[in-house]
Structures are given as C-alpha cells and as structure tokens.
Design a protein with these regions (language model features):
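N-terminal Rossmann-like NAD(P)+-binding subdomain of aldehyde/semialdehyde dehydrogenases
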Residues: 1-122
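A short, hydrophobic C-terminal helix/tail in secreted or cell-surface proteins
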Residues: 123-128
C-alpha cells in the first residue's frame, strides 16, 4: 500500500507537525489503496508563509522563465502519464481509458494551453 505522510513545503519534504493519518479508499473496490497524513493548522500556515515568500520573486519572474518552467513540467507530466493514470484509477476508482484519456489528459491539455497563452497573452508586472 502506498504511504505518503510528508508535505512538500518550501522546497523540502517535511513531516507533519501533528501526525494524523487517514486511509484513501478506492471507491471501485472499497479497499484502502494508500495512507496519507492530514495537515494541521500549523502545517497549512507553514505552507501559506512559504508560498507568500516564493511569490515575492515569482511575481517578477520573466515570461521566458515561466514558459520554461511550464514546458519542463509538461515534459515531466507526459513522462509520468502512466503513473498519474494509475493514481487516478486507485484513488477515484476510474476505468483505465477514462482515467488516461480524460482525467490525465485534461491536466496535460491545461498545461499546454497555459504554455500557448503565455507566448501571446502573458503580461507581467515590473518592479517599482
């Protein structure tokens, strides 16, 4: 069974401050397929503070940097297509074709759309 008990906060995987686990149930089989940790108020606060700090520089990143990041993400997403599909099958009980073509496909399609729009319509703020 898959166990994911840490959170990705401020560029690192960190243990929850107040561990509290829950099973993820596959609705098709009604069996547990994973164990995850629930975030506490302190975990959420840490994540929000980290995001606020990151936005200080991300908010002024260049169009080229953002597009490069999205393109890298898109490439990695396609490489992990089967892993993403398998996770959707387990966590949502979705049939394989539906999970792959529609659910996994939607994430790829949205990312590709963000890239396309970024080339032509992205306006970024400048530092004052």
């Amino acid at each position: 069974m898959l166990e994911k008990r840490n959170f990705y906060i401020n560029g690192s995987w960190v243990a929850p401050k107040k561990p509290s686990d829950i099973e993820v149930i596959n609705p098709a089989s009604e069996k547990a397929c994973a164990v995850i940790s629930l975030g506490s108020k302190d975990d959420v606060n840490d994540a929000v503070l980290s995001a606020k700090e990151a936005f200080k520089t991300w908010g002024y990143s260049t169009r080229e940097d953002r597009i490069a990041l999205l393109e890298t993400f898109y490439t990695l997403y396609k490489k992990r297509w089967n892993d993403i599909t398998d996770a959707i099958i387990q966590e949502m009980g979705a049939p394989k074709d539906f999970a792959s073509k529609l659910q996994t496909g939607t994430g790829a399609s949205h990312t590709k759309s963000f890239i396309t729009v970024s080339y032509t319509h992205l306006t970024l703020p400048t530092k004052a």
